[in-house]
Each structure stands twice: as structure tokens, then as C-alpha cells.
Amino acid sequence: MSLLTEVETPTRNEWECRCSDSSDPLIVAASIIGILHLILWILDRLFFKCIYRRLKYGLKRGPSTAGVPESMREEYRQEQQSAVDVDDGHFVNIELE
């Protein structure tokens, strides 16, 4: 009799394991935690850009414009756009020796 036949008894399905203590609550809890961990890891890898962008920037989408007149909204948009615009003619070349 070999050690393999004493420890593990193969079944017909090849996926099942005949363990006398497989109904142990600790084994069941570990299996559930392992499956949940796998599911969360897969979801994290699928949606990591959305998740971490949401954590980094929060739920904010910008300042609220409720109650602000349309003329002030347009002025704010123009200020934001002008802050983004860059004049390409003002570059400085620095040469290191």
C-alpha cells in the first residue's frame, strides 16, 4: 500500500476529493474567502481605471454652477480655457555643458 492511496482516494469525477473532514467550518470559511478574493481580484483588474480614478479625484465633477448667471459661467469657461492654452513661441533652449 502506497502513501498516495492512504492520503488521497481518486473519484470518478476527478474534481472531487473524499476528505473525511471536508465539512469542517474552517475549511468552508477558507473556501468562501478564497472565492470572494478571486472575484474581487478579477473585478479590480477589469475596472481598475474607473476605481482608482474615482478614489483619486472623488465624486467631484467641478464647481457647482447652480444659481450663477450664464454670463459668469461663460466668463469662467473662458478663464479656464485660457489657462490651458499655451503659447508655443515662448520656449527657452537650455544647453548643458
From Swiss-Prot:
Residues with Phosphoserine modification: 64, 82
Family per similarity comment: Belongs to the influenza viruses matrix protein M2 family.
Topological domains annotated Virion surface: 1-22
Gene3D superfamilies listed in its UniProt record: 6.10.250.1640
Keyword Ion transport: yes
Activation and inhibition: The M2 protein from most influenza A strains is inhibited by amantadine and rimantadine, resulting in viral uncoating incapacity. Emergence of amantadine-resistant variants is usually rapid.
Organism: Influenza A virus (strain A/Goose/Guangxi/345/2005 H5N1 genotype G)
Highest taxon, organism lineage: Viruses
Entry protein name: Matrix protein 2
